[in-house]
Amino acid sequence: RAPCMPHRFPCTASRATRPPMILRPATLEDTAALAELGRESFCAAFEHLYRPEDLHAFLAQAYSQEAVAGEIADDCCIHRLAWSDAGEDGGENGSARLLGYVKLRHPSWYTEHSDAADPIALGQLYTQPDLTGRGIGAALMDWALAEARGRGHDAIQLSVWSGNFGAQKFYQRYGFAKIADIGFWVGEQRDDELLYEKRL
């Protein structure tokens, strides 16, 4: 498998009730937490779309600890993690909890679909399923846009499932617009995806 593969991500929501959080880069010590959140978030949003064997194959490919560790170590991938303060939306015994994360990738997988000179891809934007609507995704999106601009990229690209209308509206509010129709494979099932881009 090619490192730092593209992934679909579910819709995230408003800033209204954003919990206290710390944004920081990923380290290899975060591998297990990232793999678990990736699986849980993807399944919460999309599990019903797939045959069990296709879903199992995709999760093994994309969210095994080996795959996630490879992406953390890959210089092409840039992760930013949102961790709770201990005791604030935390884990057991008041420990800190991984609330969500975003992953950027350069070079983008989608350069052939755009005339942008140096686009970057937003490959994952995941939050804990029980914290949807708390503004965590918005905070991570704000970080991703600022990071892309700070690195001098002229566009940021992402793919979204054609049937995920809530996510499409979320991205459109940030100024993303469709530039192409593409495919996304989960096991042996191909889904219709929309490629979105925002010029920076």
Briefly describe each language-model feature range:
Residues 118-120, 154-157, 161-168, 172-200:
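C-terminal "cap" of GNAT-fold acetyltransferases
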Residues 128-134, 162-163:
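Active-site acidic-Proline motif in GNAT/NAT acetyltransferases
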Residues 6-32:
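Conserved N-terminal entry element of GNAT/NAT acetyltransferase domains
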Residues 134, 151-154:
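Short coil/turn segments at alpha/beta junctions that flank glycine-rich nucleotide-binding fingerprints
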